[in-house]
């Protein structure tokens, strides 16, 4: 499903073939959809969170994590952009909104969710890009977040590589 084709209440249920999808993975998927709506429609995050809740789109998610990701990424978007921008081959403004929000979420987690291994953060971001991003965007995002992790998680990265 492409985010540009997204319709409220559609695509947030966990399909039978993906019943094993983790709560965190589902939370990230729905958070990405909320951030896309925030960026494209310029809606307030509080209104988006309320809408998602009222529409039942937070089923099978960690609601606290969803709220944290949406609020923190939206409130600190420019700061998060600065963390991955040095590794881009173009201006941040030229990055597709879906890919931009995937990278924002990734660097947010790399910086603030130290209990989640950096490889998990990158893998989850790559999977979001495969599912919602443009063709081959997952390769681009993988490279950018891997470089960002060198600065944000340098000790962890040197110990595991």
Swiss-Prot record:
InterPro entries: NusB-like_sf, NusB_fam, NusB_RsmB_TIM44
Superkingdom of origin: Bacteria
One of the GO biological process terms: transcription antitermination
Keywords linked to the UniProt accession: RNA-binding, Transcription, Transcription antitermination, Transcription regulation
A Gene Ontology term for the protein's cellular component: cytosol
Entry's Gene Ontology molecular function annotations: RNA binding
Pfam families documented for this protein: NusB
Region (Disordered): 1-22
Gene3D superfamilies per the UniProt record, alphabetical: NusB-like (1.10.940.10)
Primary role: Involved in transcription antitermination. Required for transcription of ribosomal RNA (rRNA) genes. Binds specifically to the boxA antiterminator sequence of the ribosomal RNA (rrn) operons.
Protein family according to the UniProt entry: Belongs to the NusB family.
Protein name as it appears in the record: Transcription antitermination protein NusB
């Amino acid at each position: 499903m492409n985010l540009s084709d997204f319709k409220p209440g559609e695509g947030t249920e966990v399909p039978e073939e993906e019943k094993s999808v983790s709560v965190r993975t589902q939370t990230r998927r729905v958070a990405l959809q909320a951030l896309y709506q925030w960026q494209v429609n310029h809606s307030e995050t509080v209104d988006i969170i309320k809408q998602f809740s009222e529409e039942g789109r937070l089923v099978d998610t960690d609601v606290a994590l969803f709220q944290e990701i949406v609020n923190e990424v939206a409130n600190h978007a420019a700061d998060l952009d600065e963390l991955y921008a040095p590794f881009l081959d173009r201006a941040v403004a030229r990055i597709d909104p879906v890919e931009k929000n995937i990278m924002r979420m990734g660097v947010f987690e790399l910086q603030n969710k130290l209990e989640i291994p950096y490889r998990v953060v990158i893998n989850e971001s790559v999977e979001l890009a495969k599912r919602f991003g443009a063709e081959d965007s997952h390769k681009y995002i993988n490279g950018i977040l891997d470089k960002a992790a060198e600065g944000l998680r340098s000790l962890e990265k040197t110990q595991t590589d």
